[in-house]
Structures are given as C-alpha cells and as structure tokens.
Amino acid sequence: MSVPDYMQCAEDHQTLLVVVQPVGIVSEENFFRIYKRISSVSQISVRDSQRALYIRYRHHYPPENSEWGDFQTHRKVVGLITITDCFSAKDWPQIFEKFHVQKEIYGSTLYDSRLFVFGLQGEIAEQPRTDVAFYPSYEDCATVEKRIEDFVESLFIVLESKRLDRATDKSGDKIPLLCVPFEKKDFVGLDTDSRHYKKRCQGRMRKHVGDLCLQAGMLQDSLVHYHMSVELLRSVNDFLWLGAALEGLCSASVIYHYPGGTGGKAGARRFPGSALPAEAANRHRPGALTTNGINADTSTEIGRAKNCLSPEDIIEKYKEAISYYSKYKNAGVIELEACVKAVRVLAIQKRSMEASEFLQNAVYINLRQLSEEEKIQRYSILSELYELIGFHRKSAFFKRVAAMQCVAPSISEPGWRACYKLLLETLPGYSLSLDPQDFNKGTHRGWAAVQMRLLHELVYASRRMGNPALSVRHLSFLLQTMLDFLSDQEKKDVTQSLENYTSKCPGTMELLTLPDGLTLPPVPFTKLPIVRRVKLLDLPASLRPQKMKSSLGPSVSAKSPFIYSPIIAHSRGEERSKKIDFQWVQGDVCEVQLMVYNPMPFELRVENMGLLTSGVEFESLPAALSLPAESGLYPVTLVGVPQTTGTITVSGYHTTVFGVFSDCLLDSLPGIKTSGSTVEVIPALPRLQISTSLPRSAHSLQPSSGDKISTNVSVQLYNGETQQLVVRLENIGMEPLEKLEVTSKILTTKEKLYGDFLSWKLEDTLAQFPLQPGKVATFTISIKVKLDFSCQENLLQDLSDDGISVSGFPLCSPFRQVVRPRVESKPVNAAEGGRPGEPCHVKTLEAVLNFKYSGGPGHVEGYYRNLALGLHVEVEPSVFFTRVSTLPATSTRQCHLLLDVFNATEHELSVGARSDEELILHAGECQRMAIQVDKFNFESFPESPADKGQFANSKHLEEERQEARGLEINSKLDIHWTIPSLKRTGEASVEGLLNQLVLEHLQLAPLLWDVLVDGQPCDCQAAACRVGDPVRLEVRLTNRSPRSVGPFALSVVPFQDHQNGVHSYDLRHAVSFVGSGTFYLDKVQPSGQAACLGALLFLYTGDFFLHIRFHEDGPSKELPPSWFCLPSVHVRALEAQA
C-alpha cells in the first residue's frame, strides 16, 4: 500500500468501504449529484437487530490498497456502485460489459455490487434485476436512497456470514495464515505444523474476526477478540499484526469513549436505541455504564467496560502499535495513518503536546517517492492537524510548504492559484490579517520577518496569477503594516516595486473580491506621510463672520422657550467637544492644517492630497507636496470650498502616493491630535477689499481688544495739518454688498487730541448700494491732527539756553499738567533732520477703522463681516506757543491776545490769524504775535457742580469748562501756519494753552455797561458836540448774571488828558452839569436792563473825558471790580455854529 489516506480516523475501523465510480462518459456534475445522495446513506440500522452498520464511500480508491483487507478489513472494498448514462438499447450490452470489467478490478474482495443506469427506457429497463437500477433521468430518481439501503443490507448479510464463519470454533480445522502482500514470500517453506506457526495463525485470525465484529456492530465481541489476538501475537513476536491488533483495540475503545467521533465530520455518529442521547452524555463519567444498543443485558456492558481501554491507555497502545509498525519499511503508510488517528484522539482529549509528538513522528516517516500532488496533500493534512491541536504557527508553516510545493520547479504547470489560496490560509497562523485596521490596535503581534516574507510571496503569487490589482493591494499592505520593520534599502526596494506595479494598475480604495468569495479591504497609506495633528483653521480676520447681537442677549435661543435649560447645556458633551466655536462661510476658501511627518529615508512625493468631508457639499482643492527625507513635523494646509450650508465634518484626507490612492479617516489614525473636526457653514457673505491712497505701514497695530488688522497704512503729518484719506471699496465676492457701517477707535491714549481726529461722510457712498460683485465705491476720510501746541519743559530749557527771552504768563495752570518727555523718545536721526543730541518731538497716533459690512444670504441670517484698517500717524511739531498774555484794547469789549510763537520745523514758516498779516518765522525762531479779539461770553457754560450733575467733582467741571472756552476762542482766532517750501498748511490751536487769568481777561463781564452820548454809543471813538449845547448822557446796564444786582449810584467826573501823564480834574469853569452829577440805577433782575439819564454843558472847546465811577456802598462792595468795567467816554467840544 503506497497511498496514505490522511482523512483516516479511529472510527473508520467499523465502516464498510464502498467505491462509487462512473462507467462510460458521465458528466462530473451528474456524477457528484448522485454520489452526494448515495453518500448520505452512511449509517443504517440492521433489521431485527439493535446493531448499526456504517458505510464509508470513496469515488477513487487504489485497488492495491484492497490487498491489505485481511490486515485491516476496513481497507477492503466490499461494495461497488457504478453510475452510467445510457440513452439507447444498442449501447446497453457494451455498458453492461464495462460494469463487469469494473467488478473484476475489485472482484476478490467485493461482497456485492450495483449499476445505476440513467436515461434508458423501454423493455430492457422494465426487466426486474437486483444488481441494476434504471432511472429515466437524474431528476427522476427518487428511489436511489432506498436502493442503497437494500444494497447495504446485502453487504451486511455477506459480512455477517463471513464473521460467523470465521468466528465459529472448528476444532481440528487448519486455520489459514493471513498475510499482508509483502509477507507472502517470507512464509514460503515455513513449518506449518509448528506451535509457533499455529499461534501466529490463531492470533492473526482473532484479530481479523475482531475487525469483522467491529464492522458488524458487535463492539463487545471485537474487544474480546482484540485482547485475545494481542496475547497470542505478543507471544510469538508477530509485531506487525500485534500492532494491528493493538490499533484495533484502540479503535474499538475510541468508538466507545467518543461516540461523537474524532474525525471532526459534520454530525455525530448515531446509535440506535432511544436511550442513546443520555448514554452518550454519561459515557465519559467513570462508572456510568449503559448499553449501546447491542442488547439490554447490563452484564454485557460490564464485560465491555472491562475489555475497553481507558483514554490514557488508548494513547499508550497507539504508541506501542506505531513502534511496531516502524519496524517494517513497507508499513510506512499504516504507521503514518496510525499517527494521524492518534493525533485526532489526542485533540479530543486536549493533549496538544503529546499530539505534536505523534505529528513530528509522522513528518519523518519515510514513504516511497511521492508525487508532487501527494506531497501537497501530505503537507496540507499536517497543517490541518497542527491547527486541530492549536499549533497555529506550525500549521501555517506546513500550509506554506504545501503552497510552495504547488509551484515547485519540477511541476510543468505550476498551480499559482492553489499556491495563493494556501498562502492566504497561512495568514492567521502568523498573526496576520488582511485588514490594516487590525494593526492599529496595540503593539505588533507576530514575527515581523516571517510576515514580510509571506507578504512578498503573496505579491509574487498574485502577479504570476495575472492579477496586478491583487499584487498592488498586497504590496501596499506590506508597506503600510511593516513600515517600522523595513530597513532603508528595503523601503526603497518595496516602493520601487510598488511604483512599477501601479504604473500598469493604479491602487484604489475598492474592495477586491477573490473567486472564492474572500474580500480584501482597501489599504490606505496612513503612514505615508504620518499625520500627527489636524487643526481646522478659522477664516482670516477680515473674513470671519460675526453674528449680530440680539436685543435679548446671547443666552436666549430662538429654538427653546426656556431662558436656561440644563439639559441643553450638558447633553452631548462628546459631540460638543468635537464642534469648533467658529464658522466657515459658504463659497469661501476654508483651510485645514495637518502636521505631517515623512518616515521614509528619501523624498516623499504626495500627489492629489485633499480633504474628506461629510454633511455639506464640499469642493476639495487638491494639493501636491514633496516632503524631505525624515522631515520631522511639517505643516501642510489643505483647502476647499463648502458649496452648501449646514454642519460639515472633516472626516479625513485623501492622497496618492506611489500610484496608490488612499482615503485616510481620522478615526483610524493612531495617536492623532485634533481640536475638533466639526464646524458650522453659514450662508454666503460678500467679500470686501479695501485699498487706500496712503502707503502701507511697516508698523503692525496690536489693539488691546485682540482685533486683527488686515491692512496697515501710515502717514506723516505736522501738528495741525489735515490729510484726506481716499478709501476704495471693492466687492470681490459673489454676493452683493448691501450694508456698510464705518466706526473708528483711537488706540493712542498718551496724547491729548483736540477736535475730530477722523471724520467722514458716507451718504454718497451708501447711495451706490447694493454694491454688486466686481463693483467699486470710494469715500474720503479726513485725518486731522491737533495735539497740544504748548511747549514741553525740555524745549523751554533749550530756548532759555539759547538766550531767547519771552514775557507773559507761563503755559501752565492749576488745571493742566505739563507733558513730560516720553520714555520712547529717541534722538532724531539724520533722516529727520535733528541735530545730534536734540530730543525727538515726533509723536505717534494710532487708530483703527472698522468696516462692518454684510449682504446676500448671510445678511438675511444675521451675519456680518468686519474689516479693520490700521492707521499709523507720525506727528511732527509745527509751531509751539511758548508764552501767552493779554493787553486791554481801546474798547472794553475787546482785548489783545499776545502769543510767543516758536517754529519747531526745519523750514521757514508763516503764521497768521484771521485776515491779519502773517508772521514769518525761520527754523527755530521765536516771535511774538498780537491778535485783537472780541471778548467772549462764557456764561452759557456751567458755573458750579450743582448745575451739571454728570461731573464727579469741581475739578473735572472746571476742566470741561476750560476745554469748552478754549474751543470757542480757537474757532474765533483761526490761527494757521504754512510751510511754503513743502506746500503744506495747517492750523494752530490755543486749546489747552489759556490759563485762568488769561481767560478772565478774555471774558465779558456779567454786567454789560453801555454809555450813550446824544443817543450814540460811545466806547472807543470820540463823540462830537457844540460848545454851549447841552449833551445828553445815558448809562445803560444789562444784567447777564444769574442773580439780581443793584441799586447803584454812579458819579460822572470830567477830566482832560494832557498826553504827558497829567490829568486835570478841576473843570468847573469848563464843564457844567445840567442837574445832578450823580446817577442812580434801581435794582436789576437777571437778564433785565436799567438806564439812567443826565446832561452836561461844555463851555469851551477841547477834548474832554468822562470818568464814571461807583459809590462804594453796600451793593457794589459785594461784586468783583471786574464787573464794573465801563467804557471811557471821549467828548470833543467844537465851536458853536454861528
């Protein structure tokens, strides 16, 4: 026997072997359809008996193996079933002849045979025959199973007769010597009458009868015969048959202990009798003795238990039997099959280590020269048995050996598909799976070097199969999962091979389905490059949408009727943590930053890298990048445009590396850091681009509010100068610009500003709205810088050192602090024209212009954008007022304001006020200018804290009053300067310069006195009269104070001024009063008026002056002297007309 049956198991010893073969030409499909139905009848109960008969079917069985039927009866072909097609009666004789030829092949061992004929109808088919069954077709053959049962019963009859014949004790008869084929020549010439020979014959026959009893369902009798045979054969050292007897004993014991079988076949063997399930469950318990259907006598069960081996003894007897087989070179197949049977029993007993010893012995059993197909079968069975005992890696090893055997060089047509299929089956044994997700779970499992070798073999096998897509998938899997174990050279080799493959068949993310139904998942390159962090970026500051504030406040939601709900606030914490608190805008380019790392020892080119999103229609704009070798963390920004609104989730990214397209999901990336992957997309908004007439600034403003400045512009102005800033607004978006608001915020707080620094008018610009995409609108912003024009202390010191002497009141007051030099002041450099060591007087003003605009669908939803323009203004000093004072004018309603003006520029400068002549000042020159001004009525400003409650204290009130007065005075003065060489002009302000004393001199008294001579007001001009004519004199009082005043008594004193400092008051001979020289005024209410009248008579010609003075009585003493400022009266007496 040269062909081992690797599917053998211990329970096969009780089966009858039936061969099913086709006769003539029968299609494979039809043959196996009937074969499947025939093989379903594998166990039947014998009539009138409680025994069961088991059948083992084979469609191919070497005839020479039947020659070992005396050695082990289950190897003998006892039944033959042939299947044939016959559609004509003419073919019937030839087919029947072939049937007889087929029977002759197994004729020496056959008990019975059958021929199943399909397709023949007519007279021949209607003849009743026991050995032939006719059926019209393969579909119309309902009695096949019944015919097989009858056939098996006929086999049982022959088997039973043989058993009875061999088991009957025939005293005196000579027992024949049963031999195996290779023994026949060894027994020629032996003494057949010797006692040793007779024992040998008896022992072998006892063993043979035990086999027949086991096949006939008589388990007890078989155990008895096996024991007797063992004793007889051991005594004569017949080791080969002793091993067979021991194996038979083991098989019978296995059948008793393990009624479910050891071969792992579907379904357990069924035993007749209703008590079978209970006894099968209890059979493994010591002392649980039940019948197995032979008879109901418990004594038989006791006897069987005594003769039956224990589970431990079964293995010992198997070892002994195999040791006897090993003594015979020609018994290698028997030894190999015994090892396989023992392994299956040990697998049931979960004794893996002992089973591995039997398998190791089976590996080294030397058989004849096996064919390549037999080698493949042998290694495959060894693999299955190692898998059965839990030795997965050993199983995978032999499976891989079988795979390599399929493509051995000696095979003319290598079976690459079979090789590939076997290699796939080895993967679990080497802790490999074809799902790359399994390699993201914890540490690497398995032997990486072996795994890489196996994956390389899969790549090669799939290529030889002619499936390049499969090669690309396996090579991609190798690169992705084994990257950490590849050397630098191996990385280069693998990637080069991958590029060669993908040049013909690009790698995709589709599932690959193999012919056997196995699917290979896609392999995304999550390590090429490695992504460590993903961050969704906010839009640029100028494009970030902002929500218009509701009048109800931000805590009120339109979706909930409740002001506060803890359910809303605390639910879905995980989902909230992934959602980002800024928004993207429909139609705008949005960015996601990835920190990537190239683990390869060479430059990595990544093509077509873009974002994977869900929830919103998103147009990803692919990028291509090249990462240097082992680059470290490298920032990469991926962009895209959301096309619709809603909530968008960035789920990953896609790449094309080495020709393999990958979809990499963030959830499958190990160790990745992300601040969130979900963001809200709001409706589209317009995009505003701003350009100005000023140059961009190198200074970057940093507002304390944290606002981002998109554009910075700068300008250099002289103090008091005004610059026009033209702002160009262009709608570069796709939505109309419908709303625009402009606000400003001054960032500089150290410098005191006077007047409006920035001013504009939007009416004409807004008239052009809505501003359609691509359209432009402009408007003008006026930049007016008016800082303090007073001189700083350090500059005053410089002037004093230069010998410049100025008089008047110092420029400091209780209500104004002198500005100290700033810490950031630095020497003026050569570009600014200052002398070395001269302090810098350039000041800086910074402001932010905010353009709040909206339009389109986003405006409907209440969103807007804010664009910030930073303005940096460097203010150089133009002129300084170093001293200020006043002089009275000829009119009581006017005075002279004296200003010492210093030219702080490096250019010639002219200063003027109103329409007066301009004063020319050279660089660094100081001159005094006098300006005649009308006195001011300041009574419209609050007098006390009680009059204006918003001022916290009297000091603050007084400061406000000072500023208001300074503003009014400055508006009337209209002081301006011009630098002709630069063609630059500006204004100079006295705001903040005037101290309290100067203000008092510039203020109109609360009591307004008017003197009229002959009805004409007399203030600074002489009133003419005739000598001898009475002159009417009227004094009027207007009370502008908030209180009532009076009564007053006034005296008129005439005098003459000789223009040499001498005044003559003794004018009784020259001036005469008509009536009394004293005038009386009654009490005058607030805003009221009063007047008193008198007359004078001038007797001589000349210039006379009238001095009106008050009597120092009670009412006049309560008021300050400045309230009684009456104009000087000049009367010129002329010759009387003739």
Swiss-Prot record:
A GO biological-process term: cell differentiation
Keywords noted in UniProt: Cytoplasm, Differentiation, Endoplasmic reticulum, Golgi apparatus, Phosphoprotein
Pfam family, one: TRAPPC9-Trs120
GO cellular component, one term: trans-Golgi network
Cytoplasm among keywords: yes
Record has Thylakoid as a keyword: no
Compartmental location: Golgi apparatus, cis-Golgi network; Endoplasmic reticulum; Cytoplasm
InterPro entries, sorted: TRAPP_II_complex_Trs120
Phosphoserine: modified positions: 557, 944
PANTHER family membership: TRAFFICKING PROTEIN PARTICLE COMPLEX SUBUNIT 9
Quaternary structure annotation from Swiss-Prot or TrEMBL: Component of the multisubunit TRAPP (transport protein particle) complex, which includes at least TRAPPC2, TRAPPC2L, TRAPPC3, TRAPPC3L, TRAPPC4, TRAPPC5, TRAPPC8, TRAPPC9, TRAPPC10, TRAPPC11 and TRAPPC12. Directly interacts with IKBKB and MAP3K14.
Function noted in UniProt: Functions as an activator of NF-kappa-B through increased phosphorylation of the IKK complex. May function in neuronal cells differentiation. May play a role in vesicular transport from endoplasmic reticulum to Golgi.
Family indicated by similarity: Belongs to the NIBP family.
Protein's recorded name: Trafficking protein particle complex subunit 9
Species name: Bos taurus
Gene: TRAPPC9
